[in-house]
Amino acid sequence: MTAENGAQGAVSPSLNILAQYIKDLSFENPGAPRSLQGRENAPAININVNVNANPISGSDFDVVLTLNAEAKDGDKILFAAELVYGGVFRIAGFPQEHMLPVLFIECPRLLFPFARQIIADVTRNGGFPPLMIDPIDFSQMFAQRVAEEQAKAQVQAVPN
């Protein structure tokens, strides 16, 4: 009844994807068909990424990856795409101090290739070359988020 390492009833950490889904998908091509004509310069592309996680029940969590992409030629919007892509994850056996990194680094890392492909397909289907979003460093995003929350907490802790 004891494992070889001597731990009793130790549960090895597990991370399972129970479901993946598109929560919201929007593609706007306001200048079509003129926006589809060739242009001298490559458009300026701006991409914003956000990750949220919420408990569902027990060890199940809903992790949502939001990607917003906008292409501009000067001040004219060529296209705007928004994808809210979610996954339901069952997470068990991780120490409590590892839960936030699992939710905000590992889960979005698993969702990202699917979300990236959806954005590439929708931009291609909108008449543009597929937008292949560069890999995202979710670890760096998480570290930045933690630093911002700590700075915010320090500001709130300072008496007026």
Swiss-Prot record:
Cross-referenced InterPro entries: SecB, SecB-like_sf
Gene3D superfamilies the record matches = SecB-like
GO terms for molecular function, please?
unfolded protein binding
Location in the cell reads: Cytoplasm
Q: Name one GO biological process term.
A: protein folding
Would you tell me the Gene Ontology cellular component terms?
A: cytoplasm
Q: Which UniProt keywords apply?
A: Chaperone, Cytoplasm, Protein transport, Translocation, Transport
The record's principal subcellular location, in a coarse class, is: cytoplasm
| Known role | One of the proteins required for the normal export of preproteins out of the cell cytoplasm. It is a molecular chaperone that binds to a subset of precursor proteins, maintaining them in a translocation-competent state. It also specifically binds to its receptor SecA.
Q: Which NCBIfam families match?
A: PRK05751.1-3, secB
Q: Which PANTHER family match?
A: PROTEIN-EXPORT PROTEIN SECB (PTHR36918:SF1), PTHR36918
Q: Which family does it belong to?
A: Belongs to the SecB family.
Subunit structure as annotated in this protein's UniProt entry: Homotetramer, a dimer of dimers. One homotetramer interacts with 1 SecA dimer.
**Protein name in UniProt:** Protein-export protein SecB
Natural source organism: Agrobacterium fabrum (strain C58 / ATCC 33970) (Agrobacterium tumefaciens (strain C58))
Native organism taxonomy: Bacteria, Pseudomonadati, Pseudomonadota, Alphaproteobacteria, Hyphomicrobiales
